[in-house]
């Protein structure tokens, strides 16, 4: 009763309200731990921690220099668009910064050789190949709650098959089972993800809705829960092929930030993914350098500081591969011009209504 008495307002004076608020906060701190409730501006502006995506352009497009820590991220797109490649680049960047990464391989399709080529330290990568969706999400929950893992990648949502479906007959109809599993798991995971400051990346596939006449017929698997819980949603698409004479050596890729709770969304960036190499950093430096006006492009010729550095983008890339100091100088100039580039990357809003 004494606690209730302390909280009771005896008048409408500001002093009485302030004392009542302080008593309430003290009671909450005793019950749930210090810092359970705090004033947002109490410690000044808190900078959002992030981990680089491995793509300079995407880091700029995200507005905070990478993917935000302590948040749920969704990377989705068609088959062979670069979803897993992008996720592995984030893992590599996390490890370079001294972090611990885990990969929940629900598809049982992780290629260790390819991951190594992208810069992933295989000796320190935690890998799980679960038998069903419940097991995959329980493993994720345990890793996050440990507070010792900086990033968990789940590849993919479509492969998180509920146990009831695996144990049932091949033709059994079990509508909404996976959606309920995802909804329940995300309700449980979200608070611990934020508390542990862990990034959890869900890789997702695209399906087509039947009979849609208006709007986009595309949707992602696993129901709507992930769309709501994700702080960042990245739509990745292959836009073309990179050829060396008749041989295809890579893909042109476009990534659109369709949802961003930590910075302005709807920014779009393009980069190259080279086979056996991953995201082409030099290709990005050239493209972003041109966007920022750091590199001059006249016809097929590229110039930096009034000196020609090559004819054709591929030749410039080879030139910068040899001249690493010059490449580093241009990259530093691009990073300084990130605000100008951000404005260049802004595109229209969502094309359909399922991004909340």
Swiss-Prot record:
Coarse class of the primary localization is cytoplasm
- Which SUPFAM superfamilies did the record assign? P-loop containing nucleoside triphosphate hydrolases, RecA protein, C-terminal domain
Gene Ontology cellular component annotations, sorted alphabetically: cytosol
Q: Where does the protein end up?
A: Cytoplasm
- DNA-binding as a keyword of this entry, yes or no, is yes
Q: Where does ATP bind?
A: 77-84
An example of a GO molecular function for this protein is:
ATP-dependent DNA damage sensor activity
User: Could you tell me which Pfam families the record lists for this protein?
Assistant: RecA, RecA_C
PANTHER family given in the database record: MITOCHONDRIAL DNA REPAIR PROTEIN RECA HOMOLOG-RELATED (PTHR45900:SF1), RECA (PTHR45900)
- Indicate what this protein is called per its UniProt record: Protein RecA
Q: Which organism is it from?
A: Caulobacter sp. (strain K31)
């Amino acid at each position: 009763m004494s606690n209730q008495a302390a909280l009771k307002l005896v008048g409408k004076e500001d002093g009485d309200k302030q004392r009542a608020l302080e008593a309430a906060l003290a009671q909450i701190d005793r019950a749930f731990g210090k810092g359970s409730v705090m004033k947002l501006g109490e410690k000044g502006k808190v900078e959002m921690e992030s981990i680089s995506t491995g793509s300079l352009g995407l880091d700029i497009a995200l507005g905070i220099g990478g993917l935000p820590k302590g948040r749920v991220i969704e990377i989705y797109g068609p088959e062979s668009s670069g979803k897993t490649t992008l996720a592995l680049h984030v893992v590599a960047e996390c490890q370079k910064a001294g972090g611990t990464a885990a990969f929940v391989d629900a598809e049982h399709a992780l290629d260790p050789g390819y991951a190594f080529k992208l810069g992933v330290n295989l000796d320190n990568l935690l890998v799980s190949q679960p038998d069903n969706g419940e097991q995959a999400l329980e493993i994720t929950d345990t890793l996050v709650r440990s507070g010792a893992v900086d990033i968990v990648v789940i590849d993919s949502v479509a492969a998180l098959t509920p146990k009831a479906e695996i144990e049932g007959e091949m033709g059994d109809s079990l509508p909404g089972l996976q959606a309920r599993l995802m909804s329940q798991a995300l309700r449980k995971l979200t608070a611990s993800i934020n508390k542990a400051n862990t990034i959890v990346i869900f890789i997702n596939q695209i399906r087509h809705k039947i009979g849609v006449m208006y709007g986009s017929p595309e949707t992602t698997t696993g129901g709507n829960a992930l769309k709501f819980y994700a702080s960042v949603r990245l739509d990745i698409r292959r836009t073309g092929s990179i050829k060396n004479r008749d041989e295809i050596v890579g893909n042109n890729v476009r990534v659109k930030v369709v949802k961003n709770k930590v910075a302005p969304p709807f920014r779009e960036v393009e980069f190259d993914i080279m086979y056996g190499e991953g995201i082409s950093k030099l290709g990005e430096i050239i493209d972003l350098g041109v966007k920022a006006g750091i590199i001059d492009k006249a016809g097929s010729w590229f110039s930096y500081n009034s000196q020609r550095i090559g004819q054709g983008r591929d030749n410039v890339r080879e030139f910068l591969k040899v001249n690493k100091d010059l490449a580093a100088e241009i990259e530093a100039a691009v990073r300084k011009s990130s605000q100008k580039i951000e404005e260049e990357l802004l595109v229209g809003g969502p094309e359909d209504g399922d991004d909340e």
